[in-house]
Amino acid sequence: MDPTPHGPFLVALDGQLTPVGRPALRFAWRGRGCEAVVSAGHITLAAQAGAVPYTIDRAALRPAAFAALEALPAELPEGWRLRLLPDHRVRLEHAMELEGTTTATALVSAMVGFALALDPYLDRLESAGMEAGIVKT
């Protein structure tokens, strides 16, 4: 029997998911937007981890925020990446291979593992004055 289309996936009888296009699952963790982008055998997980305080709002917190951003990459697990976006949002990313068959269980497991692993880094960013917040546009 042919795989059944379900949203951005083809689902085989054994539950294996085959991405069609570039599917992404979005979720929130501790008030932060997160995303899981799925490709064949891989998943890229990302979180908007915080934002550097604006000078107009909290200028005194900016030096600590930038110091934390400088130190944090050395503390991240292997394969993780920290990005400072042009609007001063901070993004944490992790790309990984999905072992075995890509199923809904494997995707949710990867998402939960990423969210739980984020906690100490979110704590670190918060202590340096970078909250989840909304970016001003």
Model-found features: residue ranges?
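Generic recognition of long tandem-repeat/solenoid scaffolds
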Residues: 22-29, 45-47, 92-94
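Short, internal acidic amphipathic alpha-helical interface segments
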Residues: 50-91
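A short, solvent-exposed beta-edge/loop patch
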Residues: 83-113
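A conserved amphipathic terminal alpha-helix motif
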Residues: 110-128
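Charge-rich, low-complexity N-terminal segments
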Residues: 1-40, 74-79, 83-85
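Short, highly charged C-terminal tails/helix-capping segments
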Residues: 125-137
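A short acidic-to-branched-hydrophobic micro-motif
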Residues: 36-56
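Generic alpha-helical secondary structure
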Residues: 2-6, 58, 62, 107
